[in-house]
Design a protein with these regions (language model features):
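Bacterial Sec-dependent N-terminal signal peptides
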Residues: 1-20
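Histidine-rich, glycine-flanked metal-binding segment
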Residues: 28, 32-75
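Metal-associated gating/positioning segment near the N- to mid-region
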Residues: 72-141, 159-166, 228, 252, ...
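Active-site gating loops and adjacent loop-to-helix segments of metal-dependent hydrolytic enzymes
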Residues: 87-103, 113, 159-178, 213-226, ...
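Histidine/acidic-residue-rich catalytic or RNA/ligand-binding cores of hydrolases
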Residues: 89-93, 161-162, 215-216, 254-260, ...
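Divalent metal-dependent hydrolysis catalytic cores, especially in the metallo-beta-lactamase
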Residues: 108-132, 145-155, 202-215, 243, ...
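Histidine/acidic residue-rich metal-binding segments in metalloenzymes
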Residues: 189-286, 315-334
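His/Asp/Glu-enriched, well-ordered alpha-helical/loop segment
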Residues: 239-243, 308-309, 316-387
Length: 387
């Protein structure tokens, strides 16, 4: 992956100088067609590509910038559809909730830069304490260097569910949580929680439809929302122009999510054919996150790294995710590219290409997904994901 040269380098140059920038590319990846083409010239004015031509076109002015990439392959900036930019390799969800907001703000800016320099110019952040929204705005305003961020803010969970950050803590530590905190136990709670996230500035809504690995509880795959709650979440989100993503390992919670309008399923570990059929018919997407599965399985072998409850779940769930992707891909389930970086280290996002290839997907197809298809689900295909 060392020879993958993305446009992030070019945009840095272009933002500093007012001249045109000419790139002579040895190969160019057409993300829409999922094909590689020979020598091309890319011309950039300011922060926008204004021309893409076959062969090598020389600069028109001596003031123009020339960058020789004849020995390189040039891609659009990659898009990661599952990132947690506020944290890295947590031992449990509790860690983030117990961290100081200021500390999270500083470290998340470091993770953002790592992600950008790894070639990922856009990410979808799927949950934190809310710093992710401020980080998105700071990057958009040019105050911080990092990728373009679409974020869910903080996630929605049922009481005691995977996203309930009070699991494993003293009851008196946090008091009674409700929709504002992301805790949903009724359709009315669901409606309020979505509206609160819209008010906070979220771009997406994220729910934990089933149990998970990194919370201190026994549940790893049980359904954690009712059909009525999920329907209310997706309907309210749609009213405000938002789509919904669902963390899900168990099939029942997954099925409920897709049946009630969730657009992307994260992980999908124990998916059954009935849910794959439903995803195909409703054009819902699987975001595999093989990187996270491999990483938690690896860390489960490190003595005392995880709480015993988490370690047991990591050993069970982690090793299955790559095979799940293989089954879903062969079955014809729509796939997006996402790593769950934050659970795994930031800056290593591109390892997912290798893992997807190991599980049967050709590299050019995963590159197509990480650019063109990911841009489409973000409704940004006219400005992102292709050169």
């Amino acid at each position: 992956m060392k020879n993958l040269i993305t446009l992030l380098i070019i945009l840095v140059f272009s933002s500093v100088y007012s001249q045109s920038t000419y790139l002579h590319c040895g190969q160019l990846f057409d993300s829409k067609k999922a094909k590689f083409f020979g020598p091309h010239t890319i011309v950039i004015d300011g922060e926008k590509i204004t021309s893409v031509a076959k062969g090598y076109v020389n600069p028109k002015s001596e003031n123009d910038i020339f960058i020789d990439l004849k020995s390189k392959t040039v891609y659009p900036g990659f898009i990661d559809m599952h990132v947690h930019i506020e944290t890295q390799v947590p031992q449990s969800i509790i860690q983030l909730s117990q961290s100081k907001t200021a500390d999270i703000a500083f470290t998340s800016s470091v993770y953002a830069r790592k992600t950008l320099m790894a070639g990922f110019t856009t990410i979808r952040d799927l949950g934190g304490v809310g710093v992710n929204i401020s980080l998105r705005d700071a990057i958009n305003e040019g105050k911080v260097i990092g990728p373009r961020i679409f974020t869910a803010g903080n996630i929605l969970s049922s009481t005691g569910g995977h996203g309930d950050f009070t699991n494993g803590t003293k009851k008196e530590s946090y008091g009674i949580l409700g929709p504002k905190d992301g805790i949903v136990d009724s359709p009315d709670d669901a409606r309020k929680a979505v509206r609160q996230r819209y008010k906070n500035g979220a771009d997406w809504i994220k729910i934990t439809a089933t149990g998970g690995v990194l919370d201190i509880s026994k549940s790893d795959a049980n359904p954690q929302f009712t059909n009525e709650e999920i329907y209310t979440i997706t309907k309210t989100a749609s009213d405000y122009g938002l789509k919904v993503a669902a963390h899900a390992h168990g099939d029942e919670g997954m099925y409920r999510a897709v049946a009630n309008g969730v657009k992307t399923i994260e992980h999908g570990t124990l998916i059954k054919e009935r849910t794959m059929d439903l995803m195909i018919s409703k054009k819902a997407y699987l975001v595999p996150t093989i990187s996270a599965g491999k990483f938690v399985a690896k860390m489960a072998e490190t003595p005392n790294f995880f709480h015993p409850l988490i370690e047991e779940k990591a050993r069970k769930i982690g090793p299955q995710i790559q095979n799940t992707f293989n089954r879903a891909y062969k079955y014809g389930v729509p796939i997006l590219f996402g790593t769950d970086s934050g659970v795994s280290p930031h800056g290593e996002n591109a390892k997912e290409f290798i893992y997807m290839n190991e599980a049967g997907m050709p590299i050019n197809e995963s590159l197509h997904i990480a650019t063109f298809e990911n841009a489409k689900i973000l409704d940004m295909e006219n400005s992102l994901g292709q050169i």
